């Protein structure tokens, strides 16, 4: 401030009362600041008064502190306290020393939750009594070229200006001041923490507004600040190592204990200064990471490792900032994976619960983001965080985010059973039943739906009047999600399922009368789950007239697939009753199911449930004949016998096995289809080989050794059943000739088998006396004495026994081992 300007501004500070802080070990000093603008004649023209507070935190105050010495120190350092108030300060300090701290469990109390990051305070060591003036900016720049104390003072004055957003435009236009600040930071940040903190804070003020990010980037402040952070973290590590050495020395040598205490005090002082620098540095980087490209550069420079390393600190405000930064970075899977490698869950576990509401809330939100990863959810369970989450349900500040975390955890089947050993189920039941709104919070009921999938959890829910109260609320408010939770309870066998008998009429009434499709789907699911042996399904179906309703919903296109699936499942359940199954069969529902099967053949769930209905129908004698004789259900089952879905194949096989036992015609067809399927690869190979031989080996199109595979049923070829050449002597093991073989391929005279008939190619060329010399592919001609010669005139060996059409000797017995390798297999 210029000397001539000082005449026109008068500043006056008036001390006030001193109080103790309500929750912390601190004194609150109240004072009044009065600023007056004077005219040229010294007359006051404009004045303003402002009530202010200064908090003096007493971190060293404990049961052994010298109160008198501490009071003198406070009065000497704080100019706002008049020396005459020393006795009052002593009395307040004595009260703080003896005030009992509340022992309420951390995280269980409901404190103040701001939900936003606080701006870092100015560096405590550089608080000035003078007020900065934008008109004196040139003087402040000159201070940056002086010694270190003057540099600190100059940066503190510029910081005062920068903290006022109205001054940022003018400071931005002054490249000299920004360039000087960047130069000093780059050259001297290692020499003074105070200087580095002030300059980083100035650029932080610019980073708070997106339009000034280009200024910060121009001077490469982001990269410089990351270097500062990394250096400070390494320095902190060396401090800890040095302090640990002195602690060990003090334990071994009591004389050095005083030196250790002195070092500890110095360490805490340095730590406090360093954490101020780290806080403003991370805040600046967080603001700059608004640009994804800048954030990627930070990631490549290991910002995640630096942040996770900082989680070891105890400063709540610094931790809030660090966790917020990690939460922002964690939305990208690459960053999440790196956090997992850096053991982030172990670092966050110590923060749950904690006394600071904002820190606890942002930590839970980060854990919620991380809980999308299955492995990280498992790590939370291993570290014992589940009971901690459950305890936090009592805190309204965190209840919603905790419900979301618990919902993610409950998705894992192994984790569901662990909820049994916590107070989670009683707590969520209380929340559901005491909810003032008609529809429950979706996070709350979603957690209940997942937990109800576990049998032990379902039993806990049903204890006492639990199921009764849930049903009463669901029926009163027609809540489909609550009914879904009840449906999950109904799927478990045991005592809980029997409790549903009381509510069957209410559930059936919803099915028949409700227009809410979601509600009807869940009601159908409950009915389909009630597989109770003594339940009279026929009476229920008749009482509410559900058969016409079921037939209507089974018409293709009449309802959504979810509803159709539940209807089919209900039919499968009621079909377990003989009389009810007969009633459904007579009503034509089976034909409706077949039509639905044709329409929904791509939907595996619906197909599987329809096949299950057929399985139930063929189980009962009353409906078995209807299924087998009056419908084409077995044919559809044969088509589905080799479906890609293993569950469909399994149910099909079981159903077809039952059909085979009671109907010979279908048994033969089923056996034939199984044979075709089992040997399909071999049959395709034989077919392709025959076609290839036919295309290349015949001189004329009408020549043929035997009927082609494509001209007749492949299963009517006994030679394919028993080997490439059939039974070589036309006999079976018992010596009898198989009739089919004789009809097609053999001659019988006086009850004796005379062998295969001559082929079309050779049958008229040779007389019977030369039958044993049927030429093979090598024969050229015969000599006068009947000796066969090949095309080169060489004699060919004459077989003593008979040969086949290819010149190969016919084996008198069936060679099982060799033929089995050539012929088809059989699935039995």
From Swiss-Prot:
SMART domains: ARM, KAP. Signal peptide: none annotated. GO terms for cellular component: axoneme; ciliary transition zone; kinesin II complex. It comes from the Eukaryota. ARM repeats lie at residues 332-372, 373-411, 577-611. InterPro entries: ARM-like, ARM-type_fold, Armadillo, KAP3. GO terms for molecular function: kinesin binding. GO terms for biological process: cilium organization; microtubule-based movement; microtubule-based process. PROSITE patterns: ARM_REPEAT (PS50176). Keywords: Repeat. Disulfide bonds: none annotated. Heterotrimer of a 115 kDa subunit (KAP115) and two kinesin-like subunits of 95 kDa (KRP95) and 85 kDa (KRP85). PANTHER family: KINESIN-ASSOCIATED PROTEIN 3, KINESIN-ASSOCIATED PROTEINS. Binds to the tail domain of the KRP85/KRP95 heterodimer to form a heterotrimeric kinesin-II complex and may regulate the spindle vesicle targeting of this complex. This is Kinesin-associated protein 3. It comes from Strongylocentrotus purpuratus (Purple sea urchin). The gene is KAP115.
């Amino acid at each position: 401030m210029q000397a001539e300007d000082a005449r026109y501004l008068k500043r006056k500070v008036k001390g006030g009362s001193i109080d103790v802080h309500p929750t912390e070990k601190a004194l609150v000093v109240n004072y009044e600041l009065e600023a007056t603008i004077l005219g040229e004649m010294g007359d006051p023209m404009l004045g303003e008064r402002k009530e202010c507070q200064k908090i003096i935190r007493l971190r060293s105050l404990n049961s052994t502190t010298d109160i008198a010495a501490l009071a003198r120190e406070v009065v000497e350092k704080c100019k706002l306290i008049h020396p005459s108030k020393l006795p009052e300060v002593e009395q307040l300090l004595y009260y703080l020393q003896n005030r009992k701290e509340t022992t309420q469990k951390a995280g269980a109390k409901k404190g103040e939750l701001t939900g936003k990051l606080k701006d870092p305070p100015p560096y405590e060591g550089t608080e000035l009594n003078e007020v900065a003036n934008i008109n004196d900016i040139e003087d402040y720049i000159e201070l940056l070229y002086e010694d270190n104390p003057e540099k600190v003072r100059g940066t503190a004055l510029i910081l005062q200006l920068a903290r006022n957003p109205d001054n940022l435009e003018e400071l931005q236009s002054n490249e000299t001041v920004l360039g000087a600040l960047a130069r000093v930071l780059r050259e001297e940040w290692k020499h003074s923490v105070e200087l580095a903190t002030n300059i980083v804070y100035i650029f932080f003020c610019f980073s708070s507004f997106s339009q000034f990010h280009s200024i910060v980037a121009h001077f490469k402040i982001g990269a410089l600040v990351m270097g500062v952070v990394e250096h400070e973290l390494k320095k902190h590590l060396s401090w800890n190592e040095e302090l640990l050495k002195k602690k060990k020395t003090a334990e071994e040598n009591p004389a050095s204990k005083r030196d250790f205490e002195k070092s500890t005090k110095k360490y805490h002082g340095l730590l406090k200064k360093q954490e101020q620098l780290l806080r403003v540095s991370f805040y600046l980087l967080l603001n700059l990471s608004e640009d994804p490209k800048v954030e990627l550069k930070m990631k490549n420079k290991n910002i995640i490792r630096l942040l996770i390393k900082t989680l070891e600190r105890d400063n709540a405000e610094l931790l809030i900032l660090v966790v917020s930064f990690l939460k922002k970075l964690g939305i990208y899977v690459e960053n999440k994976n790196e956090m997992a490698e850096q053991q982030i869950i172990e670092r966050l576990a110590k923060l749950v619960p904690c006394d600071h509401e904002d820190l606890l809330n942002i930590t839970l939100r980060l854990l919620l983001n991380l809980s999308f990863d299955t492995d990280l959810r498992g790590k939370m369970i291993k570290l014992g965080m589940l009971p901690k989450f459950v305890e936090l349900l009592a805190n309204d500040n965190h209840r919603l985010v905790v419900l979301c975390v618990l919902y993610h955890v409950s998705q894992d089947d192994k984790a569901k059973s662990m909820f049994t050993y916590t107070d989670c189920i009683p707590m969520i039941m209380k929340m559901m039943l005491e909810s003032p709104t008609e529809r429950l919070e979706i996070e709350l009921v979603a957690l209940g739906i997942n937990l109800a999938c576990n049998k032990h959890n379902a039993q806990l829910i049903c204890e006492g009047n639990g199921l009764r109260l849930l049903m009463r609320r669901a029926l009163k408010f027609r809540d489909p999600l609550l009914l879904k939770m009840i449906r999950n309870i109904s799927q478990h066998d045991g005592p809980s399922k029997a409790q549903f008998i009381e509510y069957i009429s209410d559930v059936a009434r919803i099915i028949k009368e409700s227009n809410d499709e979601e509600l009807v789907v869940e009601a159908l699911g409950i009915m389909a789950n009630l597989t109770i042996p003594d339940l009279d399904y026929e009476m229920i179906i008749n009482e509410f007239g559900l058969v016409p309703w079921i037939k209507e919903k089974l018409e293709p296109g009449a309802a959504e697939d979810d509803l159709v699936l539940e209807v089919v499942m209900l039919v499968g359940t009621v079909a377990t009753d003989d009389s009810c199954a007969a009633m459904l069969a007579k009503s034509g529902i089976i034909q409706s199911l077949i039509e639905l099967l044709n329409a929904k053949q791509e939907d595996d769930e619906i197909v599987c449930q329809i096949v299950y209905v057929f399985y139930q129908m063929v189980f009962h004698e009353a409906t078995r004949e209807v299924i087998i004789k009056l419908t084409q259900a077995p044919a559809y089952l044969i088509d589905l016998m080799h479906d890609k879905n293993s569950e469909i194949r399994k149910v099909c096989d079981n159903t077809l096995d039952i059909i085979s036992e009671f109907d010979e015609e279908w048994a033969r067809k089923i056996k034939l289809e199984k044979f075709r399927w089992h040997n399909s690869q071999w049959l395709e190979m034989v077919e392709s080989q025959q076609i290839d031989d036919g295309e290349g080996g015949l001189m004329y199109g009408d020549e043929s050794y035997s009927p082609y595979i494509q001209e007749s049923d492949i299963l009517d070829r006994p030679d394919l059943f028993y080997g490439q050449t059939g039974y070589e002597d036309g006999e079976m093991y018992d010596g009898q000739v198989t009739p089919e073989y004789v009809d097609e391929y053999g001659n019988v005279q006086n009850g004796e088998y005379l062998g295969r008939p001559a082929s079309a190619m050779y049958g008229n060329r040779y007389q019977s006396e030369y039958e044993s010399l049927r030429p093979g592919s090598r024969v050229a001609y015969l000599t006068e004495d009947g000796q066969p010669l090949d095309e080169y005139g060489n004699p060919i060996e004459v077989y003593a026994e008979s040969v086949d059409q290819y010149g190969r000797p016919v084996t008198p017995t069936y060679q099982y081992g060799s033929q089995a390798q050539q012929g088809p297999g059989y699935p039995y």
